[in-house]
Amino acid sequence: MKKTAILLLYYFLLIGCNSFINSKESDLESLQLKSSFIDLEENNLDFSKFNNGKVVVSFWATWCAPCIKEMPSIKRAEEILDDYGYTFLLVSDETIDKISNFKNEMNFDLKFLKSNKSFESIGVYAMPTSYIFDENGKIVETFVGVIKWDSEEIINKLKAL
């Protein structure tokens, strides 16, 4: 009984995590319709500028130890996959000041963004949660939990997409 309850909970969490998808737009466009994203200089980010490349959007928080743990491997993966057209975007729903202070204190050279809506309102219920979008803006992979982004297995998977 306990096992069934856990499986049902997991199933509903996965369904919830993909709830931002709208069949009329690409998954990436649908995500942007649900929320607006700004960079640390408070410029709006238009996801259409990534139409010809692959995008990894990772949802995280400054208080999330597993999120912080995977950031160095995200940076290494970004460098390894430079010739494969990948852009890595790290999205938080915290304040610009909090994200900027975190970036400066941790000295992470990554693309940090702020979502203007709470994660729950766009269907993200666990952190870190990462979505990989192909060149057409379609979700091709979803990861919930810590990923060793620079592992041979993940790098090969991303190269093959």
Task: Describe the function of each predicted region.
Residues 34-55:
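A short beta-strand-turn-helix
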Residues 1-4:
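Positively charged n-region of N-terminal signal peptides that target proteins for export
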Residues 59-76:
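Conserved redox-active cysteine motifs that mediate thiol-disulfide chemistry
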Residues 89, 100-135, 144:
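Short, internal strand/loop/helix patches
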